[in-house]
């Protein structure tokens, strides 16, 4: 059963990740359709899942949410490396946004809805100035999602990602708060 409501999108809700969600995380994070394109997810056993929950998901370094419809978990979204607050001179006020969804929920608009809501939270509630995202050049779905939400391709790290037996470029995307706000009008 997902935790209490944190944010609400059009079709999904975002909730804190709870210990009860570890079964879902374990199943999906071990699915090659998720960990291969994500590039930084390692397959894990239950003990490693517990450790991941304790050291990453339960830490105060970042925001980690479970995207759900009703009571069904769909995927995970995160804001990490965030430096936020009202003091514009001493903080960069930037964060990296990341997401992954269970394969059975791909292509249904849940990722776009959930990511848009987390972006809104980052800019309006956390006063961030910019968001960044990394994606392998082979991941057309994720690139399409980012671009549909206004992210701009800012650079490429050539042959920085190993995927399915080949090196691929790693693309860096960025979105500024002003760009997001003008796209919402």
Q: Predicted regions span which residues?
A:
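Proline-rich low-complexity regions
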Residues: 2-6, 43, 61
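Generic alpha-helical structural context detector
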Residues: 26-27, 54
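Polar helix-capping/helix-linker motif
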Residues: 31-32, 59
């Amino acid at each position: 059963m997902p935790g209490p409501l944190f944010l609400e999108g059009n079709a999904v809700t975002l909730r804190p990740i709870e210990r009860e969600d570890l079964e879902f995380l374990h199943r999906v994070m071990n699915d090659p359709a998720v960990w291969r394109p994500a590039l930084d997810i390692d397959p894990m056993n239950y003990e490693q899942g517990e450790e991941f929950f304790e050291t990453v998901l339960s830490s105060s370094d970042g925001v980690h949410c479970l995207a759900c419809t009703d009571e069904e978990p769909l995927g995970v979204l995160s804001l990490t490396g965030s430096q936020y607050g009202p003091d514009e001179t001493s903080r960069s006020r930037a964060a990296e946004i990341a997401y992954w969804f269970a394969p059975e929920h791909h292509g249904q608009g849940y990722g776009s809805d959930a990511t848009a809501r987390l972006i809104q939270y980052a800019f309006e509630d956390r006063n961030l100035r910019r968001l960044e995202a990394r994606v392998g050049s082979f991941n057309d779905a994720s690139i399409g999602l980012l671009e549909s939400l206004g992210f701009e391709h800012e650079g490429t790290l050539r042959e920085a990602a190993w995927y399915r037996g080949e090196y691929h470029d790693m693309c860096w995307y960025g979105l500024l708060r002003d760009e997001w706000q003008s796209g919402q009008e």
